[in-house]
Amino acid sequence: LKANNQMKDIIYVHKNPDRHYVVSYGIHFNEFAMNARKPLKNLLLIKHQYEHGAFNIHTHMEYVEKDEMKKIIDDGVQSYGDFCWIDFEEEVGVDELNGQEIAELLYMGHIKQPLNPPFYSKLNNRYAYLSHDDGWFNKVYYRDFEDFYYMLGATLSSKLSTMKSGKGLFGMKKEKPYPVIGKEVIHSFQDKLKEGMVISLEKAVLTRGKIEIPIWVIGDYYDMDEMAEDYKQIRKLPANGLLSYDRKTKSWSALLK
């Protein structure tokens, strides 16, 4: 059973620095794309159900050009099942991929794991994005983890700005959009990210002029049903850290326990 419904206001992230990927739950492709540090380039679609892509004859794969990005962002990719892509700079580079490299991309989409580090000079890609039921299980390879820190901080503040618990977060009139959580704040959670942590918007607390979002270290999961079950137990314990927003100075800080 997918505990999807009752778990929508949490984000799980586990960073594997050696292999350059992050596994996550609760971050969807549209959030990833709209909160990217640099706008996404063209996407070579490895596994998908998108019906408006252009066809690349050399690889027999479809692709999305950057000026068409809004279409795929609005397409509801979480209903595709598997959604896997790699970004690229120029189609000329895609046409230069050899048989071995095309085979590596197909293998990666199928197994959700690359045979070799999935960064190709021909594509000059920043990411390899592998998801199943997008937002439920996402595994993203980052050439530069700064892209991850920025995206996570921006996604969290945008989620907070749009959260609806029927009456807006905490039943208050909606505040102006929250500023992006700076990467130095996210950096403070380096070690916890490596262990696997949950950022719980559902357990956010409003205190005098502050919003505090608790964080629990929960471990390394591939099975998100299991993660959600374990989270329901761990959220009864004191949090391992907080993301704190000062509504007066409009600034974010990290509190580690």
Mark where each language-model region is.
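Structured alpha/beta or helical-core interaction and ligand-binding surfaces enriched in interleaved
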Residues: 1-210, 216-257
